[in-house]
Amino acid sequence: MIQLRSVLDVADNTGARKAAMISRKGQITATAGVGDIITVHIKQSSTEATVKKGEVHKAVVVRTKAPVRRADGSYLRFDSNAVVIIDPTNNPRGTRIFGPVARELRAKNFMKIISLAPEVL
């Protein structure tokens, strides 16, 4: 699970490298899992980025280090915590997604992210 102030990798080509979670949409609890929409603060970005350091954006969690339990009893776990920055219509701001994403995004209607991802686990 991702908590408040957790530093996450950004898995798209918006130019942001690291982002910190500052809130979760629609919930009082301060934790987030795969497929949750969160608000992030950009901690580190490249010089020619479309999003700059210090900006606040919405993002969706695509990978977590904490295991995700599936209906068949199996668990899925990634090596890093990662997010994809999204616009107000829940479409990704970038045009590429780096690394695998969880299949649970399909159930939460993030089809554009699923189609851009190189691998869906």
Swiss-Prot record:
Parts forming coiled coils: none
Gene Ontology biological process: translation
InterPro entries: Ribosomal_uL14, Ribosomal_uL14_bac-type, Ribosomal_uL14_CS, Ribosomal_uL14_sf
Disulfide partners: none
GO CC terms, sorted: cytosolic large ribosomal subunit
UniProt KW keywords: Ribonucleoprotein, Ribosomal protein, RNA-binding, rRNA-binding
Keyword Ligase: no
Keyword RNA-binding set for record: yes
Single GO molecular function: structural constituent of ribosome
Recorded family membership: Belongs to the universal ribosomal protein uL14 family.
Quaternary context: Part of the 50S ribosomal subunit. Forms a cluster with proteins L3 and L19. In the 70S ribosome, L14 and L19 interact and together make contacts with the 16S rRNA in bridges B5 and B8.
Functional summary from the UniProt entry: Binds to 23S rRNA. Forms part of two intersubunit bridges in the 70S ribosome.
Identification of the protein by name: Large ribosomal subunit protein uL14
Organism: Opitutus terrae (strain DSM 11246 / JCM 15787 / PB90-1)
